[in-house]
Amino acid sequence: MLPFKKIVCPTDFSEPACRAIKAACEMAETFSAELILLHVVGPVPVLETPTGLAGFDVAAYQRELSNSANASLQTRLEKHVPDAVNARTLVVHGEPAHEIARVANEEAADLIVLSTHGETGWRHRIFGSVPEKVIRYAHCPVLAIHLDS
C-alpha cells in the first residue's frame, strides 16, 4: 500500500474538488506517484416523446460534454498541478461512483483522493453519496477530503 505509486483524483470541477486535487498533488509529490485527474460524464437524461427526440443528437451532446470536460481537466492540470508531479487526465462516461472505482482498479491505483460536499437531505438518504459508494466499490484505499478541510 505505501508508498503510493498511482493516485486517482476524480473531480466534478467544484471548489471542494479543487481541494482534493491539492491534497492529491501533495501526496503525489511526496511519494513521486503518478496522478490521474479523472472526470466522469454522467448519463444524459433523455425523455423520449411520442414524436421521438425531435432532432436531439445524444451522441453529439455526449461528445460535447467530453470535449468540455477534457478542456476543464487540462485547465485544472495547468492551474493546480505542479510541474514536479507526473499527471495526466482521463474522461470516462457512466455512473460516477462505479466509474471511479473501475478506473482505479483498471489503472492499478494505490489510492483514490476525492472530495465530499457534505450533502444531506432526502437525496442523500435515498441515493447515498458518490464518496460513500466509491468507498464501498473501490479495491484500494480512499481518502475523502471534507468540505471544511
Stretches found by the model and what they are:
Residues 2-55:
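Small/aliphatic-rich secondary-structure junction motif
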Residues 38, 88-92, 143:
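General small-molecule cofactor/ligand-binding pocket signal
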Residues 52-56, 106-107, 130-131:
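Short, hinge-like loop/turn segments at secondary-structure boundaries
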Residues 56-71:
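A short acidic, glycine-rich active-site loop
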Residues 140-148:
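Short, flexible loop segments at boundaries between secondary-structure elements
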